[in-house]
């Protein structure tokens, strides 16, 4: 499964999508036995590895006394029962930021991984690289810098989620949000410019531009 963005990227724009607007059929793990100390979140009855929880994911946590109630970034999966979590960071290379310590935590880890995978496929199709274009001699692993694609992917994912929510509730606000993020996606895709290592030598051989969707030899 390919992907240019993750759930933590979406969290920066729309935290509500991991709260009351989460998709119940895309919950990876949920229970009521969580404990949080510093940046270490533990749940004795969990198996985060089998649940396929990944770094870059998002966990919603609420303590029994209500002192903790929010969504946080998953920095790493340290064992089957332990995660390193953080208040959302501006840069994934920054040190984790501790949420308020608490116990008796109800938690839920939901994902938009399937939507991110679909967005990535559509982007590779648009830019003419595999897997979107199976006939291409350039694979997604040959892309050297994916930051521009990440931004476009985030907007595409959020737009698709709000379209799905609008279809279920007929809420005009959801439709408006979907259209808003669709416009952001189209602009971000048009501005995309990234390098491709077509020769597998670690050097940029080709530049892709969203304005044309065509290859430009360097």
Question: Over which residues does each language-model region extend?
Answer:
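Surface-exposed interaction regions enriched in Ser/Thr/Asp/Glu
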Residues: 54-55, 90-117, 121, 125
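Autoprocessing Asn-cyclization modules and mimics
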Residues: 4-94
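Short loop/turn elements at secondary-structure junctions
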Residues: 1-28, 155, 159-218
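Short amphipathic alpha-helical segments and their helix-coil junctions
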Residues: 112-147
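Residue-level marker of positions within ordered structural domains that often coincide
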Residues: 79, 124, 162
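Long alpha-helical scaffolds
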Residues: 33-34, 119, 159, 185
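Alpha-helix boundary/N-cap detector
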Residues: 107-114, 118, 148, 152, ...
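Short, surface-exposed, charged amphipathic helix/loop patches that serve as local interaction elements
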Residues: 140-148, 152, 161-165
